[in-house]
Amino acid sequence: MPVQVKICGINRPDALAAAVAGGARYVGLVFYERSPRHVAPELAAELARQVPTGVRVVGLFVDPDALMLERVLGSVPLDLIQLHGEETPERVAAVRAAHGIEVMKAVKVAGAADLDRAAAYEGACDRLLFDAKAPKGVAALPGGNGLSFDWTLLAGRTWARPWMLSGGLNAGNLAEAVRATGATAVDVSSGVEDRPGHKDPALVAGFLACAAAL
């Protein structure tokens, strides 16, 4: 089964074009102002309109309130909401019920206990995403930090929802990450950038080529 790829943090047409041309299944737009990948709703709407049928548009939010979700969803055609903050299972379920759009919940992983806690979200969301938890005392964004976690923690685990692997992925470690975890879907952001927030179309193409070869 081919590995599906999400290119997250798209904020320019050339990065979007590279993602689509390379076979990305998902493209992510970040609605978190502290991120260097943040896009305003107006630009996000313009980019989303360029996405062809068959590629799903994901909106990444960090602890959004109802007003923010309504403002973005009112202008940007999203296929999936990604919640990447400290949202509780109850909040995730409420967002899912309110908007009628698939919801993917990011779970930050440092150890096995974090994966155990992920089970609480299985009834609240449509998909899970496993990302690396930043070490204590390290100033980091909620995602896109280029950090990975111990992939063997996922080996042999089964989930009631489809899931995606994220955290520190790049063309050089993708094959090992998929082998170690059994992931059938992966999410990359900083691993296809030449500087924070700037996707390199050549790196995007290279990552997608590696995924296609698995």
UniProtKB/Swiss-Prot annotation:
Keyword check for Isomerase: yes
Disulphide bonds in the chain: none
GO molecular function terms listed in the Swiss-Prot or TrEMBL record: phosphoribosylanthranilate isomerase activity
Pathway stated in the Swiss-Prot or TrEMBL entry: Amino-acid biosynthesis; L-tryptophan biosynthesis; L-tryptophan from chorismate: step 3/5
Keywords assigned: Amino-acid biosynthesis, Aromatic amino acid biosynthesis, Isomerase, Tryptophan biosynthesis
One Gene Ontology biological process: L-tryptophan biosynthetic process
Domain of life of the organism encoding this protein: Bacteria
CDD domains for this protein: PRAI (cd00405)
DNA-binding in keyword set: no
Reaction(s) the record says it catalyses: N-(5-phospho-beta-D-ribosyl)anthranilate = 1-(2-carboxyphenylamino)-1-deoxy-D-ribulose 5-phosphate
E.C. numbers: 5.3.1.24
Broad class of enzyme this protein falls into: isomerase
Family stated for the protein in its record: Belongs to the TrpF family.
PANTHER family: N-(5'-PHOSPHORIBOSYL)ANTHRANILATE ISOMERASE
Name of the molecule in the record: N-(5'-phosphoribosyl)anthranilate isomerase
Source organism: Rhodospirillum centenum (strain ATCC 51521 / SW)
Gene transcribed to yield this protein: trpF
